[in-house]
């Protein structure tokens, strides 16, 4: 009888362990609406369902806008020492008034939940200093129209990896972006394609997200426009999908369950 009770208790605890699994996430946005977004600064949604990050309709300079998915995303589960992998696909269009002298660019970013806009200009609304700031807890993939390159920024506007990409040459054209993060190797990869010109750009870096961002993050976009009328540009996101999963969870969960059973039985 005692053995039977112990077995029942063990099975209950295993089921409880399974119930407390990490939170995978997935969404697909073909047309944006304000109900599933946190909009900050000048960001808004057009009648066509496009995400408009910067406002330069009246040649306003120094515009900044941020938009994040309304639900927080779990990146790290410290209870089982498990880090999520993720992938995101989106399309965007940057339209500069003067494609040879425009600023500043657009970024896809992981930021703290409840984060507020930071400095404008080259800081892209994501950072308050050029130096490494661990408290920023922000990782961003930046499409830098000043330097015509893709950057990977980790808690600083000083990139840890860059690759040239001619945004000026593709002014006003739709770009297709895919970003993947493979957690077992901390491998962050970015690929961009301009279908109209067939130009491709790639960049990658090793980023230990468990050390650089908080366990729960907001995912989304931030952009800033030039501080002079001749350098203004618009940043529109046309579609967006995101998926995250704890790919090692099943193995770790089984191992944890077996340890629990062995200790009890």
From Swiss-Prot:
Residues carrying a glycan: 33, 89
SUPFAM superfamilies linked: Concanavalin A-like lectins/glucanases (SSF49899)
Pfam families (UniProt xref): Lectin_legB
Covalent S-S links between cysteines: 165-201
Record's keyword annotation contains Glycoprotein: yes
GO biological process, one term: defense response
Keyword Signal: yes
GO MF, one example: carbohydrate binding
InterPro entries: ConA-like_dom_sf, L-lectin, Lectin_LegA_CS, Lectin_legB_Mn/Ca_BS, Legume_lectin_dom, Leguminous_Lectin
Function (record text): Seed storage. This carbohydrate-binding lectin has toxic effects on bean bruchid pests. Antibiosis properties of legume lectins are proposed to be due to the lysis of epithelial cells of the intestine by binding to the carbohydrate moieties of these proteins.
The protein's name in its UniProt record: Arcelin-2
């Amino acid at each position: 009888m005692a053995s039977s009770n112990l077995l029942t208790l063990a099975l209950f605890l295993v089921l409880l362990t399974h119930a407390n699994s990490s939170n995978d996430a997935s969404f697909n946005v073909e047309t944006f609406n304000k109900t599933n977004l946190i909009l900050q600064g000048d960001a808004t949604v057009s009648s066509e369902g496009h995400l408009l990050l910067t406002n330069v309709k009246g040649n306003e300079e120094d515009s900044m806008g941020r938009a994040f998915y309304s639900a927080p995303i779990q990146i790290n589960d410290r209870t089982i020492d498990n880090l999520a992998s993720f992938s995101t696909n989106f399309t965007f269009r940057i339209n500069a008034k003067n494609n040879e002298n425009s600023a500043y660019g657009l970024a896809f970013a992981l930021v703290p939940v409840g984060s507020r806009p930071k400095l404008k200009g080259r800081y892209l609304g994501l950072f308050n200093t050029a130096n490494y700031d661990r408290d920023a807890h922000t990782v961003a993939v930046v499409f830098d129209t000043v330097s015509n390159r893709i950057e990977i920024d980790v808690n600083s506007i000083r990139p840890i990896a860059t690759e040239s990409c001619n945004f000026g040459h593709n002014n006003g054209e739709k770009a297709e972006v895919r970003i993947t993060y493979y957690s077992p190797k901390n491998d962050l990869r970015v690929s961009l394609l301009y279908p109209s010109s067939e130009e491709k750009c790639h960049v990658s870096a090793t980023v230990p997200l468990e050390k650089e961002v908080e366990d729960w993050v907001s995912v989304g976009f931030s952009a800033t426009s030039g501080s002079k009328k001749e350098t203004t540009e618009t940043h529109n996101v046309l579609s967006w999908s995101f998926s995250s999963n704890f790919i090692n969870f099943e193995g770790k969960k089984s191992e944890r369950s077996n340890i629990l059973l062995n200790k009890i039985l």
